[in-house]
């Protein structure tokens, strides 16, 4: 009796604990590698969007805490209630990013290991009510951000119901969303906090408060009669600072979530993602380049001679040989763990795809509101619809951008499998010299007002063409692994170089000499006058 009671008090023995917490106890070992590889390669690793929406799916899960906070009208005098933290599976091993987005602590709580419950972070103090003008604008902004059930979407449901048969948006609607996304990104770049949800000053002030409270009891007792008069002033200053920081964070959070949703819409073609769940529930992907995670688009027939299969479906050269599949004895546990991880990631992709397909198309009411804002700030220029000429082909199926077969052959043959050079040629073919010359590039930099400057106002390049070229370069280099894919900074540099050369009176493609960038690959002994003379007589092409 006594040994049994002692064993019950001590809990499970060491072998049992190891069996329960072993890293490979949850993973099911495969009888052979063939079914595992079939499961791994039969499913796409990227989100593939079908042109037609499938049958109605079950309703999506409730929105994360940040979405509910964004939907609460800020103009109300009562502080918005803090939503309870949603329950997550214990074995996931990932801390929910929604808690990190809505928490005001400077550092997020680390993710607990599998099998251990994660201690929920204390709820932050409710944000103070804003002033009347800011509250009205923010509440209207929240009504645009929110795409859930509510009075703000009454017209949306009716508009979406009338367009239920056709999910494709018109060119004007796409132009409105593209222009609004570009203006939101410009506002974000000009904010002092840089679009971050937390600020360093805020965290330092919180740490200083904690350090002040952490002093010993004797010191506080000695300083009590001295600091009593100062504490009231410091508390008022801290309250003012907290209010300012929370207002700043709310504005930045609204703009960032809305900009991310519009950018995701642009990347997903005809299926928009204007909801906050993608920015808050999956916040660990917020710092990743959105173009690198864009869904698969068809290239509209533009392929190079050595074309491999699409990303996520490896070619025959990357598949293992039959002899390797027969060797099941050397299949290590780490490989089994990786196979299980791949399958779990594919299941996550399928869940994301189902959520993406369940999002409604933006209704006409939202589009009219965005168009009104753009027209009020004189930022919407209706672009003439580009008519495809005979022999021209479309770069991407979702964008009205066309080039001829001769131009495509010239660009591919002269690019030397470099994505930057290909982008330079495409800019030369898609934009005219005047469009580049009288534009402010991508509109990302803060322009200083120069007095006495004459001529038309400089506006950003057509966002539809810019987005099309960006995505086409990414998709082309992804589909052709032998091509060199440029980074986001290098793509922006190519656009700015093209605008700079157009302003200097040169042809658009004259900087396509022998190097990858502006004067790269040229003889460094040659002066700029010689380079300019070469570009004038056309020898620089």
UniProtKB/Swiss-Prot annotation:
Coiled coil start-end: 333-360
Biased composition (Polar residues): 304-319
Stretches the record annotates as Disordered: 1-135, 297-330
PROSITE patterns on file: BEN
InterPro entries, A to Z: BEN_domain, BEND4
Cystine bridges: none
Keywords: Coiled coil
Start-end of Acidic residues biased regions: 320-330
Pfam families tied to this protein: BEN
Chain ranges of the BEN domain: 398-506
Record's compositionally biased regions (Pro residues): 53-66, 111-131
GO molecular function annotations of the record: DNA binding
Feature: compositional bias, Low complexity: 87-110
The UniProt record lists the keyword Coiled coil: yes
Protein name as catalogued: BEN domain-containing protein 4
Species this chain originates from: Mus musculus (Mouse)
């Amino acid at each position: 009796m006594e040994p049994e009671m002692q064993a019950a008090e001590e809990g499970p023995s060491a072998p049992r604990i190891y069996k329960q917490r072993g890293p490979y106890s949850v993973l099911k070992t495969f009888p052979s590698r063939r079914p595992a590889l079939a499961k791994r390669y039969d499913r796409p690793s990227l989100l593939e969007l079908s042109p037609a929406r499938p049958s109605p799916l079950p309703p999506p899960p409730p929105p994360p805490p940040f979405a509910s906070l964004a939907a609460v009208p800020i103009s109300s005098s009562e502080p918005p209630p803090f939503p309870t933290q949603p329950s997550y599976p214990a074995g996931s091993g990932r801390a929910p990013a929604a808690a990190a987005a809505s928490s005001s602590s400077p550092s997020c709580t680390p993710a607990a290991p599998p099998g251990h419950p994660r201690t929920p972070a204390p709820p932050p103090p409710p944000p103070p009510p804003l002033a009347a003008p800011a509250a009205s604008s923010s509440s209207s902004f929240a009504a645009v951000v929110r795409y859930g059930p509510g009075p703000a979407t009454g017209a949306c449901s009716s508009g979406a119901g009338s367009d239920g048969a056709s999910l494709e948006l018109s060119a004007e609607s796409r132009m409105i969303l593209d222009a609004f996304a570009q203006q939101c990104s410009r506002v974000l770049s000009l904010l002092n906090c840089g679009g971050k949800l937390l600020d360093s000053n805020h965290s330092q002030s919180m740490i200083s408060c904690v350090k002040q409270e952490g002093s010993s009891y004797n010191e506080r007792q000695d300083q009590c009669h001295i600091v009593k008069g100062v504490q009231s002033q410091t508390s008022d200053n801290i309250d003012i600072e907290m209010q300012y920081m929370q207002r700043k964070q709310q504005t930045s959070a609204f703009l960032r979530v809305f900009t991310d949703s519009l950018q995701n819409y642009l990347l997903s073609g005809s299926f928009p993602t204007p909801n906050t769940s993608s920015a808050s529930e999956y916040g660990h992907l917020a710092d990743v380049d959105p173009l690198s995670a864009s869904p698969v688009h068809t290239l509209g027939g533009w392929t190079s001679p050595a074309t491999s299969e699409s990303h996520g479906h490896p070619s025959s050269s990357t598949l293992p040989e039959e002899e390797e599949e027969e060797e099941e004895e050397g299949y290590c546990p780490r490989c089994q763990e990786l196979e299980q991880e791949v399958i779990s990631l594919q299941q996550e992709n399928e869940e994301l795809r189902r959520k993406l397909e369940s999002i409604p198309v933006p209704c006409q009411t939202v589009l009219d509101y965005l168009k009104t804002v753009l027209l009020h700030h004189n930022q919407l220029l209706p672009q003439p619809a580009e008519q495809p000429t005979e022999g021209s082909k479309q770069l991407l199926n979702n964008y009205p951008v066309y080039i001829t077969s001769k131009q495509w052959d010239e660009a591919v043959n002269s690019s030397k499998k470099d994505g930057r050079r290909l982008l330079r040629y495409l800019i030369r073919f898609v934009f005219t010299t005047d469009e580049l010359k009288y534009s402010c590039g991508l509109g990302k930099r803060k322009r200083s007002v120069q007095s006495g400057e004459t001529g038309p106002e400089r506006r950003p390049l057509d966002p539809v063409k810019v987005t099309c070229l960006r995505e086409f370069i990414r998709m082309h280099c992804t589909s052709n692994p032998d091509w060199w894919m440029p980074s986001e900074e290098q793509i922006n540099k190519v656009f700015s170089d093209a605008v700079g050369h157009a302003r200097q009176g040169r042809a658009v493609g004259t900087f396509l000499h022998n190097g990858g960038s502006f004067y790269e690959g040229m003889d460094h002994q040659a002066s700029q006058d010689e380079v300019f003379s070469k570009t004038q007589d056309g020898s620089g092409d």
